[in-house]
From Swiss-Prot:
GO terms for biological process: coenzyme A biosynthetic process. This is Dephospho-CoA kinase. It comes from Nitrobacter winogradskyi (strain ATCC 25391 / DSM 10237 / CIP 104748 / NCIMB 11846 / Nb-255). GO terms for molecular function: ATP binding; dephospho-CoA kinase activity. PROSITE patterns: DPCK.
Length: 199
């Protein structure tokens, strides 16, 4: 089974691209959704122990947690040390299930794939991109986004140009969903011929 890592900076259209891979019959692991789930389950106690006052009724309050870690690199590192092992276990279980089901390709959707060294655990990397204007429009359309929060997120992400240089495939979401579907079909056809390179 070929494992594709799907990544892209904020506002590039990665979630839509992941959904379209899924619609094409490809199993997709969503790291963000898994984080949401573990914040309501097994990570809550660990997060509260490391960052007191960040849980409510046994669930992580993302806004309270964000306020404690967004501008503190050491705190962010501590949070990652809690979350990443749990995410790894879920991702491995997903990949085993996908392989057992006979999938030829599986996608892992990881926003910080390059930033965490995750590209070494996949066979190919797809980077999702768009124009800076469309990216900005999408980001500002999010009700909970502030310029301060955006700057903090962007500071943790590799620049789009660097991600595109390191990608095996680039999906441009600037031209609508049908264009993205076409690009996904082309990627899946090309990926079927690629050698496996996971370490």
């Amino acid at each position: 089974m070929l494992v594709i890592g799907l990544t892209g900076s904020i506002g590039m259209g990665k979630s839509t691209t992941a959904r379209l891979f899924s619609e094409a019959g490809v199993p997709v692991y969503d790291a963000d959704a898994t984080v949401h789930a573990i914040y309501e389950g097994e990570a809550a106690f660990l997060v509260e122990a490391a960052f007191p006052g960040t849980t409510v009724n046994g669930k992580v309050d993302r806004e309270k947690l964000s306020a404690k870690v967004v501008h503190d690199a050491a705190a962010m590192k501590r949070l990652e040390q809690i979350v990443h092992p749990l995410l790894y276990d879920y991702r491995q279980a997903f990949l085993q299930q996908a392989e057992r089901s006979g999938a030829a390709v599986a996608v892992i959707d990881v926003p910080l794939l390059f930033e965490t060294g995750g590209e070494r655990s996949v066979d190919a990397v797809v980077v999702v991109t768009t124009t800076p204007e469309i990216q900005r429009e999408r980001i500002l359309a999010r009700g909970n986004m502030t310029s301060e929060k955006l700057k903090a997120i962007q500071a943790r992400q590799l620049p789009d140009a660097e991600k595109r240089k390191r990608a095996d495939f680039v999906v441009d979401t600037s031209h609508g969903v049908d264009a993205v579907r076409t690009q996904i079909r082309e990627i899946l056809a090309a990926a079927a011929k690629m050698p496996r390179r996971r370490s």
